[in-house]
């Protein structure tokens, strides 16, 4: 995929105005309304590009689709199992676009280390619950919940992630 094609896909991902029925701009004093729409074919086309990046990198690739006040959307492609992680400051809503994986949630991170403010990673999870994920599934992971994606050998998993700011209260 050349640079022009990549830019065209990004433009279609971000320039979503006018796709939503029932959301029109009005001339009143309320805050402007908007609606962003990313079709499954456009997301899968972009995921194909990320899959190429993942092959030449560490086996996973992701990028921010769009940032909003209080949350952001990311496109993520996995060619291998991910590290276990805990995000203290945001919840995640995963929409599975393509593939299968096992999601482990809960339990405790093993060999944990800090990667940034409110973010920790680890080698794996001990004592978590396993769930099988498939294309079309929607998953909510609360802030502070350890989680990890495990893939079978030579499988690909693509998802849209909505990260939502959420304080964890003790």
Report the location of each language-model feature.
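Conserved metal-binding segment of the jelly-roll/cupin
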Residues: 132-152
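Short, conserved beta-strand element in jelly-roll/cupin
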Residues: 88-103, 107-109, 115-121
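An anionic, turn-rich surface loop/hairpin at beta-sheet edges
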Residues: 112-134
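A short, N-terminal "cap"/entry segment at the start of jelly-roll beta-barrel domains
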Residues: 1-86
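Short, surface-exposed beta-strand-loop junctions and turns on beta-sheet-rich folds
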Residues: 109-111, 155-156
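A short hydrophobic beta-strand segment most commonly corresponding to one strand
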Residues: 154-170
